[in-house]
Amino acid sequence: MAIMSDKWIKDAVMNQNMIRPFAAKQVRVHNKEKIISYGLSSYGYDARVSNEFKIFTNINSTTVDPKNFSEYNLVDREVDACIIPPNSFALGRTIEYFKIPRDVLVICVGKSTYARCGIIVNVTPLEPEWEGHVTLEFSNTTPLPAKIYANEGACQFLFLKSDQICDTSYAERQGKYMKQVGVTLPLT
């Protein structure tokens, strides 16, 4: 597997509609204000988080159970900036919609701006022929409230191209998160 360059990413966007909307260069300023960057980078794509968040709460004193997940664990917010409580967790989603080629696996890493503030983003791999908005998992590892800015860069996706096409893609095995739109909760 090889990591793919900005040139390959641009070609995949133009020929396979891999990312939409797509920013062909790094965007660092919006309306004359500095923002957390997003867009095409040398060997990846920095995606934005939308204004749709689900923040974990203990108001209802429920248990977080991945096999029987309750929406009572969360508070929904549509905001320009999401405040994550100390040592807590929130879900968001990318603005960008991804369509992954059959011979590509995508991994996500955090942005240093957030990581240096104790905010960690986690995403499981985007598998061959998966498509949808990516649900982003944000952890606030600090003892203080932490802020995530909507419509700004949140994470970077790295595209790994295989030298061999997989026998069965995510679409063919009818993965449960196929074509997800919005913040998607755990499914079993």
UniProtKB/Swiss-Prot annotation:
Assigned protein family: Belongs to the dCTP deaminase family.
This chain belongs to the protein called dCTP deaminase
Q: Which domain of life is it from?
A: Bacteria
Top EC class of this enzyme: hydrolase
Any one GO MF term held by the record is:
dCTP deaminase activity
Catalytic site positions = 137
Q: Which SUPFAM superfamilies match?
A: dUTPase-like (SSF51283)
Q: List the taxonomic lineage.
A: Bacteria, Pseudomonadati, Pseudomonadota, Alphaproteobacteria, Rickettsiales
Native species: Rickettsia prowazekii (strain Madrid E)
